[in-house]
């Protein structure tokens, strides 16, 4: 499963990249606003750091406007993936982007039916939001399972990019289900490296190492 970092902060992205585990980046207007840089500049900088897909989101809800913004974003770098909302107009735009060779990440997916339509429209990725589904008293991982199963049943090339991952359990469950990729903030990536027994074992090894006689 590919690991993406969900961030617009170049320092966070570089830190995650230094671990050698990051395959791509997802951003959204909220994350880029926190970075305090113009969108095109921020995306260009991210593309210089990570040699993988970088999702950049349009801020439009009408097909022609989505197409205009998306085409401009796609010009920034060959790795840019245009994020479009999972609405009627977004699907119309995704279909045209696909015909133009522009990769898309159809985002804000909350049902398997939505995901199926996104795949039929030619989306490169579809992003089911597991954490937000859980917040609404649903089962986010069951949604991912449904989407993965449907895509396998019908041989869709669209990849499942599990989003809104809140903790390591979400990450492991997504991998077990067969999600193609998962995106998460740096905080969760760091949580994945930690385990209390690792800390205990390391502390013991370091303590025992001090007992080894030094060679003269």
From Swiss-Prot:
Keyword line: Cytoplasm, Pentose shunt, Schiff base, Transferase
Organism this protein belongs to: Sorangium cellulosum (strain So ce56) (Polyangium cellulosum (strain So ce56))
Function per UniProt: Transaldolase is important for the balance of metabolites in the pentose-phosphate pathway.
Catalysed reactions listed for this entry: D-sedoheptulose 7-phosphate + D-glyceraldehyde 3-phosphate = D-erythrose 4-phosphate + beta-D-fructose 6-phosphate
Name of the gene: tal
Active site positions, chain numbering: 83 (schiff-base intermediate with substrate)
UniProt-annotated location(s): Cytoplasm
InterPro entries xref list: Aldolase_TIM, TAL/FSA, Transaldolase_3B, Transaldolase_3B/F6P_aldolase, Transaldolase_AS, TSA/FSA_arc/bac
Pathway: Carbohydrate degradation; pentose phosphate pathway; D-glyceraldehyde 3-phosphate and beta-D-fructose 6-phosphate from D-ribose 5-phosphate and D-xylulose 5-phosphate (non-oxidative stage): step 2/3
SUPFAM superfamilies named among the record's database cross-references: Aldolase
Descriptive protein name: Probable transaldolase
């Amino acid at each position: 499963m590919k690991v993406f970092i969900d961030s617009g902060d170049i320092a966070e992205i570089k830190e995650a990249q230094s671990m050698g585990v990051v395959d791509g980046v997802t951003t959204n207007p909220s994350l880029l606003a926190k970075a305090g840089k113009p969108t095109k500049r921020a995306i260009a900088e991210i593309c210089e750091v990570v040699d993988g897909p970088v999702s950049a989101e349009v801020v439009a809800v009408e097909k022609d406007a989505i197409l205009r913004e998306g085409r401009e974003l796609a010009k920034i770098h060959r790795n840019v993936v245009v994020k479009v909302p999972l609405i009627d107009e977004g699907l119309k735009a995704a279909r045209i982007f696909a015909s133009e060779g522009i990769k898309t990440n159809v985002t804000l997916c909350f049902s398997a039916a939505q995901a199926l339509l996104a795949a039929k429209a030619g989306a490169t990725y579809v992003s089911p939001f597991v954490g937000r589904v859980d917040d609404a008293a649903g089962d986010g991982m069951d949604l991912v399972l449904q989407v993965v199963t449907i895509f396998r049943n019908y041989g869709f090339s669209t990849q499942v990019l599990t989003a809104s991952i809140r903790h390591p359990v979400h990450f492991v469950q997504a991998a077990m289900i067969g999600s193609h990729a998962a995106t998460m903030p740096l905080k969760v990536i760091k949580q994945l490296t930690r385990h209390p027994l690792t800390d205990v074992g390391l502390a013991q090894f370091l303590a025992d190492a001090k007992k080894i006689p030094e060679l003269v």
